[in-house]
Amino acid sequence: MALAHTLGFPRIGRDRELKKALEAYWKGELDQPGLLQVGRELRRQHWQLQKDAGIELLPVGDFAWYDQVLAHSLAFGVIPERFRPADGQPTLDTLFAMARGVAQGCCGGAHAQEMTKWFDTNYHYLVPEFTVDQAFSLSWTQLFEEVDEALALGHAVKPVLIGPLSYLWLGKAKGGEFDRLELLERLLPVYGEIFQGLAARGVEWVQIDEPILVLDLPQAWKNAFERAYNLIQREPLKKLVATYFGGLEDNLGLAAGLPVDGLHIDLVRAPGQYPTILDRLPAYKVLSLGLVNGRNVWRCDLEKALEVLAHAHERLGERLWVAPSCSLLHSPVDLCREDQLDEELQSWLAFAVQKCEEVAILARALVEPEAPEVRQAFEVSRRVEASRRRSTRIHKREVQARLAAVRPQDSRRASAFAERAVQQRARLELPAFPTTTIGSFPQTSAIRLARQSWKQGRLSQAEYTEAMHSEIRHAVQVQERLGLDVLVHGEAERNDMVEYFAEQLDGYAFTRFGWVQSYGSRCVKPAVIYGDLSRPRPMTVEWIRYAQSLTGKVMKGMLTGPVTMLMWSFPREDVSREVQARQLALALRDEVSDLEQAGIRIVQIDEAAFREGLPLRRADWPHYLEWATEAFRLCASGVRDETQIHTHMCYSEFNDVIESIAAMDADVITIETSRSDMELLEAFEAFAYPNEIGPGVYDIHSPRVPAVEDMVKLLSKAAERIPAARLWVNPDCGLKTRAWAETEAALANMVAAARQLRQANLA
């Protein structure tokens, strides 16, 4: 029989118990013993849930108080000087300080470590900071404590570690450039110490995650794998190297040949690496096949998965293991909690607990195909697949016909930017260095209470509309008083930049308990795309029309772009991401056109996740960038030349996608640049970016009110790179999370800075 195991399990709890406990601890409402008890109870529950589902070898070490990479940094003694305790011994509070920073009132203050996306998921990790003289030592023994807990409960365990090469790859050199591979020999002894500690506890297997094996690796890093694992093999324990999020491709031979006892591959993201892997795998080695999708919410097609397993079982026998494609960290916890989804839609879904059951039933089907539980599970799977194939809620002829009728000219504006710009300037009559904001204004407790009361039926539609109108009036009055040139309505009615639109589109569904961890205590509940997407009615027009009626100044319409809508949702698996993005683009195109018809002269289409969608392998970039830019243009190109299209992007690297950003052909792009001191504009200058740009002049993530002179300096730097006639003045990002007092003060200074620049340019 193939062994059923998982690579990791969600840590947040069915009711987000970890989130609630962490936030209570940070507020001083829960002491550390209470927090530790919550962690112990969650681990106990999660191990039992997996065991009850039929998982035979349970992961230990997948629990983390904030992030698994950060936990490794603490374990390895990779603690930046600004956080290092005087006695050298890190504590739980050290970990939280590294993740969240330390306030100025404590020890002079210390900024948090950088956070970035975990490969191409929507999870974020804390980036390790390495110095050229970096020392490593076993400094945090949480893994040993958790192994002891699991063993005491009678579980068969498989501790989980991030591998040494992936850990170094995920970090950054600080205090000067150097090759992180130079640190490898210093790091490996700590792994040896951990392996020895686990062996002493009677552990047989350890899982070593090396997800960078699915990336384009420099030759030096490939060579380092062989060097590192030749040393690691001398240590006790059987070792399973786990890869996920993509195919091994040119690294397949390297991974298969590593001197370890097993290899896990992701057959959801990269089914093509099977059966090739069988011919490269040594005869002694276990092969773990990831056949159940660990990062989406759909049921597995059991018959299709069993075909692969049965073939592998003939070749491998007991050397075959079955698992999800990756850690279940990226899946919600338990579908059984859902009580408001309709029966048919719920039958199509599987969360982490159900995915464990699928893994276990697949393993059992190899040896007991006629067992009643196996036959029943496969019968349900067949019914689900048939239901999804013929469902008219999924497959809508009118949506498919409209998509098929799209012509190349539908993704192009009528005229080139230079011609459009002349018409837009004549229509908008804006001054040089026009000022605006990115869209959202502070979401106060009163706004949240009104929305909650309306959704719960305690506030009528008319009462809710008046409450939102009051907030819009306030936002418009503040902007007019401050002297901003292009106004926004403030987005008071929006709970989330994706969910607000998804709730109004056909083809989206929403769960009550489909939470996944984004980072630390931050959890998100992505909408689920289950079918063809369309817009039954206008989504924003009445709010924006009302806002425009309050002022003679230009009011921007605000939309979330098709790529961002897709990337921040659980997508369908039966059609490509490209098709889903184009369906979203057509739905949003209708909204853009309706805004134009309502007299709105500027429409902003945010694409915050445009870069996040990039595939892990460079060879796959061109196809993604082609359809992602086409989706944006399809969404934005149905308007007249005099209507100005804006987009907003907030990330720190443009050089490698600048051509595609230009190909989007937005009239104005606003970007996050203040923290880089305008250095990000180098990419736009070098490329000779032809359209208009609004480089962010202050960091909205900080409560600090920027000085006028600081913003004047930044704008002057920007004007050295971009012609002044094409520069806009705006914050880095939306102001949803800020308070009104600091927002007004910062915007007043921003307007003053723009006026100074205008006077200087006229002089």
From Swiss-Prot:
Pathway listed = Amino-acid biosynthesis; L-methionine biosynthesis via de novo pathway; L-methionine from L-homocysteine (MetE route): step 1/1
Q: Which residues are L-methionine-binding?
A: 438-440, 491, 606
* Reaction catalysis annotation: 5-methyltetrahydropteroyltri-L-glutamate + L-homocysteine = tetrahydropteroyltri-L-glutamate + L-methionine
Which of UniProt's keywords are assigned here?
Amino-acid biosynthesis, Metal-binding, Methionine biosynthesis, Methyltransferase, Repeat, Transferase, Zinc
Q: Where does 5-methyltetrahydropteroyltri-L-glutamate bind?
A: 16-19, 117, 522-523, 568, 612
EC number, as in UniProt: 2.1.1.14
Keyword Amino-acid biosynthesis assigned to the entry: answer is yes
Residues binding Zn(2+), per UniProt = 648, 650, 672, 733
- Single biological process term from Gene Ontology: methionine biosynthetic process
Instruction: Indicate yes or no for the key word Transport.
Output: no
Q: Where does L-homocysteine bind?
A: 438-440, 491, 606
Free-text comment on the cofactor: Binds 1 zinc ion per subunit.
Q: What are the catalytic residues?
A: 701
Q: Which GO terms describe its molecular function?
A: 5-methyltetrahydropteroyltriglutamate-homocysteine S-methyltransferase activity; zinc ion binding
**Cofactors demanded by this protein:** Zn(2+)
Homology family: Belongs to the vitamin-B12 independent methionine synthase family.
Function statement: Catalyzes the transfer of a methyl group from 5-methyltetrahydrofolate to homocysteine resulting in methionine formation.
* PANTHER family, per database record: 5-METHYLTETRAHYDROPTEROYLTRIGLUTAMATE--HOMOCYSTEINE METHYLTRANSFERASE (PTHR30519)
Protein's name in the database? 5-methyltetrahydropteroyltriglutamate--homocysteine methyltransferase
- What is the native source organism of this protein? Pseudomonas paraeruginosa (strain DSM 24068 / PA7) (Pseudomonas aeruginosa (strain PA7))
